[in-house]
Every structure is written in structure tokens, then in C-alpha cells.
Amino acid sequence: VKQMKNYRQHFDCSCYTHCVEVAFWAYWLCKKLDLDYKSAARAGLLHDLFLYDWRNSKKRLNLKKFHAFIHPQIALENASKITDLNPIEKDIILKHMWPVTFFQFPKYRESFIITIMDKLSALKSFHDYLYNSVCKKKFYRYAYLFLIGLVFRVF
């Protein structure tokens, strides 16, 4: 799992950081909702265990499909080599890309929570990247504030 620190996931976020973030928030929410928070946390840590740079590996690894469609299966295979997984954890890892993988519909509530946390983590990474790259320049700082104002209809 620590090898995930070597691979970038979204923008400046490593795969490891992304998975820890997803696992933490899924654990917290599942515990609040009295669901299987242990399975959610374990699967959250393992849901992106694919160990390759997805931006330039399609030809090198001879992948037949796009990364978004194939990495859940690769992550499940890698996670199964490390530890035994229960059915909830398997479902979470395989179906965390829903609705992109439209026919891979999540079976458990914990799977939906991981799916949502995964998308929120990606949005947070995008926001952090945008904020750090744009808001360091004075002109863009005001443009960013204006854009946020438009999005949330403050003006």
C-alpha cells in the first residue's frame, strides 16, 4: 500500500493520500450511520491499489480498456494478494467507479459511500490545484473569487 505514494492520482495528490482521505471520510460517515465502517475503511484504503501511472501506461501495459474501466479489477486482484476480503470490501473495490462504470451498480450502502467519497476527494484535489495555481497571482485571485461568487450565486 505504501508504494501508492509513488503514483500521482489527481493533480498534485498521490494515490496513497487520496485513498487515506477516502478511507477516513468513509469510516467517519459509516460509523455515524451504523454501517460496517471497518470494511469501508479497509476497502477505502485499497480501492485504487493499481500501482502504475495511469496517465501514460495504456500502451506500455497493453491495457485493452481505459483506466477508469479497468483499474477496479486490477485493484481487487492486488488487494486480494495482500489480504482476505469480505464481500462488502470486494463490492466496494469493484464498483467504486460507478456511475462511470454504469453497469457495475453498487450492492451495499458502504459501496455508495465510498463512491461518493471518491468523487468528493477528486473534486477537493481539483479545487486545491486550482486554488494553488490560480490564487497565487493577484489578478487571478480576484477572478477566482468572482468565479466562486458566480457558482454559489453570491453576487
Mark where each language-model region is:
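Metal-dependent phosphohydrolase cores
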Residues: 1-155
